[in-house]
Amino acid sequence: GRSVAIEFLRDACTAQVDLLYAATSSKDLFYLISSEHKAWYRREHGSLSQDAAVAATSLAWDCLDVLSQLATPVPCDLSDIWMASKQRELHSDYEDDLIIAAAMRAQADLLVTNDVKLCSHAPVAAMNVEDARSYLTTLK
């Protein structure tokens, strides 16, 4: 999972591929990183200290900083919300529908996701991370 995704990012940067992400996903990434770190700390130490909570938030911000160095956010406006609503019949996950809308707005060549349902229903070219790594080799 994660190691393949990291390898994909490394390969994409080496190939100088323009990477994009839905700006709406940054809040999800921030939340996941912070909450995962807090959960890990609780498992290891029994409870969450104030310093650990601050560190988790700082880590999440640092990860967003790295993301902004690797990829460009695709903004979201009312037209993306409209486009997401049109995807509801195919894929009823609103967050994923916003990702589809971002890919369509950016006219992305490829949507990379390990979400099998999203891959199968996306109205844009989509593949999982392992297949996307293989695809990168064809661009050289």
Where do the language-model regions lie?
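Short, well-structured N-terminal submotif of metal-dependent ribonuclease cores
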Residues: G1-T24, I33-Y41, T137-L139
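Short amphipathic alpha-helical segments and helix-helix/interface helices
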Residues: I6-R10, W61-L64, I99-I100
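Residues at the C-termini of beta-strands that transition into short coil/loop
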Residues: A23, D77, V129-R133
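Short, flexible helix/strand-to-coil boundary loops that buttress conserved ligand/catalytic motifs
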Residues: I33, R88, A122-P123
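Acidic, PIN/NYN-like endoribonuclease modules and their adjacent C-terminal/linker elements
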Residues: I100-K140
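Active-site neighborhoods of divalent-metal-dependent phosphate/nucleic-acid chemistry enzymes
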Residues: S68-L110, N114-V116
